[in-house]
């Protein structure tokens, strides 16, 4: 970044310039290899960062205090450097950077262990992979930091800015950082998808999130790994631009979760168990924004924010994921208290309707009883209502059923073939996204495209179980069908009206349906009514 590389450049301290020494003796620590010699004139060049900033000398207690005093010009430059609140204070020393790296490692390792040992609600494979790679990333950073500090100590100095510069220029760390941040940003998309309830909103969040994540990481990789031959404005603007893009994405992520908190504030306030977790989530999702504000006020914090960037992503993923788990448990308990259960949305209703879950199939009327049913005015009213519902269901099935779609195989019209191609592409894309949402992101739905894990007993065991004749039948206990005496005739009437043959051509459309739970509802209607 432009200001990251330029903020150290300024006035050159006097101790970093070549110092002319008068006649004297030259003493080396390796006196066996380099014996003591007498020189008439010498030029001394002190180790400095970017040839302008003095560094911490590790030989002060060994050489200077024992054999000689420091040069006056060196002591004066060090006092001037440490008095500078921007560069030489303790907050920007190598000690604070070591503490920052150590704290980051502890936080990431703790959250990784928390994710891997969470047996109540198992996290997705994407979250597990991201946290494990984050652990590998911080482990590489710690090992590389130890090697760099060991080299500095061997050369007789310690400097935090040089440590950060070498860490940022180390390609293996940059490659792992690219992969880890990409996966963690996709995890943020996963959490946003868990907030939305409609499948249409989840698909849109998946599409927009994946595109934004890939675009930001590609630009970041270009800014990190591509060095233009000629220095121009693009080489300075691109790193700053991608930095602002990451901050904007983090702000959008935090804003979406905040809006969801506000919309569910009554449920949150009614459950004291998630108060602390909600407050912690609300604070931690804004940590990248806090680092950005600190960066604007003080440019050096950007160096520390690069160390904490992966930590911010891990915290911003694991804590909201756990909050979503707790909140979903509360919502499931609330839905169990009601009769209707969870709500269905329009896109789910149309998808469920092609499985004919909401279609009341009418028995074919016998020719002998045709006049008898038409004599009763009540039956006429019920028949009209049932006819209207049957027309509506037939209309829905006609638009969604694969058997009623026109066959354009022999149609040579380019427009029809193009429309058919678009339809097939759309169906394939929706199937792919639904598989990713259900399998990869561990976001279950009421209706899934796979029934491999669903077990049940089949009707007509003696017949051949072909692909289009399988029907999963849940096991019901006999006690569920016990009705009061007064409502027995109502049950018989409803069963006669809603009975349907089990061997229909639409049975194959009732496959691929998950039944997560069922609730027994008994309507006690007296015989007088």
Swiss-Prot record:
Ranges in the topological domain labelled Extracellular: 1-96, 152-172, 226-241, 295-298
GO biological process: cellular response to alkaline pH; cellular response to lithium ion; cellular response to neutral pH; cellular response to pH; filamentous growth; filamentous growth of a population of unicellular organisms in response to neutral pH
Keyword Transmembrane: yes
Protein name: pH-response regulator protein palH/RIM21
UniProt superkingdom: Eukaryota
Entry annotated with the keyword Membrane: yes
Record's bilayer topology term: Multi-pass membrane protein
Location of the region described as Disordered in the Swiss-Prot/TrEMBL record: 364-417
Chain segments annotated as coiled-coil in the UniProt record: none
Lineage: Eukaryota, Fungi, Dikarya, Ascomycota, Saccharomycotina
Transmembrane segments: 97-117, 131-151, 173-193, 205-225, 242-262, 274-294, 299-319
Family: Belongs to the palH/RIM21 family.
Listed InterPro entries: PalH
Predominant localisation class: membrane
Keywords on record: Membrane, Transmembrane, Transmembrane helix
Compartments in which it is found: Membrane
Database matches in Pfam families: PalH
Cytoplasmic side: 118-130, 194-204, 263-273, 320-529
GO cellular component: plasma membrane
Stated role: Required for the proteolytic cleavage of the transcription factor RIM101 in response to alkaline ambient pH.
Encoding gene, per UniProt annotation: RIM21
Residue stretches of biased makeup (Polar residues): 398-417
């Amino acid at each position: 970044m432009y200001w990251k590389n330029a903020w150290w450049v300024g006035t050159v301290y006097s101790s970093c310039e070549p110092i002319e020494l008068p006649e004297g003796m030259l003493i080396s620590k390796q006196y066996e290899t380099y014996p003591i010699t007498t020189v008439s004139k010498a030029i001394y060049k002190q180790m400095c960062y970017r040839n302008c900033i003095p560094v911490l000398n590790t030989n002060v207690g060994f050489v200077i205090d024992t054999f000689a005093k420091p040069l006056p010009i060196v002591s004066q430059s060090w006092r001037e450097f440490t008095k500078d609140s921007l560069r030489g204070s303790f907050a920007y020393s190598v000690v604070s950077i070591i503490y920052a790296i150590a704290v980051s490692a502890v936080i990431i390792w703790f959250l990784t262990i928390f994710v891997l040992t969470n047996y109540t609600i198992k996290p997705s494979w994407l979250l597990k992979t991201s946290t494990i790679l984050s652990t590998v990333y911080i482990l590489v950073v710690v090992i590389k930091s130890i090697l760099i500090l060991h080299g500095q100590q061997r050369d007789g100095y310690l400097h935090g800015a040089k440590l950060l510069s070498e860490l940022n220029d180390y390609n293996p760390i940059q490659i792992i950082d690219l992969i880890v941040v990409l996966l963690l940003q996709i995890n943020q998309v996963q959490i946003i998808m868990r907030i939305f309830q409609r499948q249409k909103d989840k698909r849109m969040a998946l599409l927009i999130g994946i595109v934004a994540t890939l675009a930001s990481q590609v630009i970041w990789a270009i800014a990190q790994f591509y060095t233009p031959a000629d220095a121009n404005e693009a080489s300075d603007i691109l790193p700053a631009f991608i930095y602002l893009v990451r901050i904007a994405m983090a702000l959008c992520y935090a804003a979406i979760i905040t809006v969801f908190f506000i919309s569910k504030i009554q449920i949150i306030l009614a459950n004291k168990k998630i108060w602390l977790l909600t407050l912690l989530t609300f604070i931690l999702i804004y940590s990248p924004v806090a680092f950005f504000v600190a960066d604007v006020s003080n440019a050096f914090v950007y160096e520390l924010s690069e160390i904490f960037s992966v930590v911010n992503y891990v915290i911003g993923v694991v804590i909201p994921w756990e909050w979503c788990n707790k909140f979903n448990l509360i919502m499931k308990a609330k839905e169990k208290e009601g009769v209707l259960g969870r709500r269905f949305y329009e896109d789910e209703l149309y998808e469920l309707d092609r499985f004919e879950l909401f279609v009341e199939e009418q028995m074919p009327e016998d020719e002998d009883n045709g006049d008898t049913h038409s004599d009763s005015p009540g039956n006429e009213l019920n028949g009209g209502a049932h006819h209207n519902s049957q027309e509506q269901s037939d209309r829905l099935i006609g638009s969604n059923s694969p058997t009623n779609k026109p066959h354009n195989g022999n149609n040579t019209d380019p427009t029809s073939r193009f429309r058919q191609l678009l339809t097939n592409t759309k169906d394939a894309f929706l199937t792919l996204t639904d598989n990713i949402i259900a399998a990869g992101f561990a976001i279950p739905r009421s209706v899934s495209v796979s029934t491999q894990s669903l077990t049940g007993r089949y009707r007509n065991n003696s017949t051949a179980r072909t692909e289009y004749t399988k029907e999963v039948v849940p096991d019901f206990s006999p006690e569920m069908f016990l009705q009061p005496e007064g409502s027995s005739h109502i049950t018989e009437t409803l069963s006669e009206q809603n009975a349907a043959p089990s061997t229909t051509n639409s049975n194959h459309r009732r496959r691929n349906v998950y039944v997560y739970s069922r609730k027994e509802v008994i309507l006690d209607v007296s015989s007088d009514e």
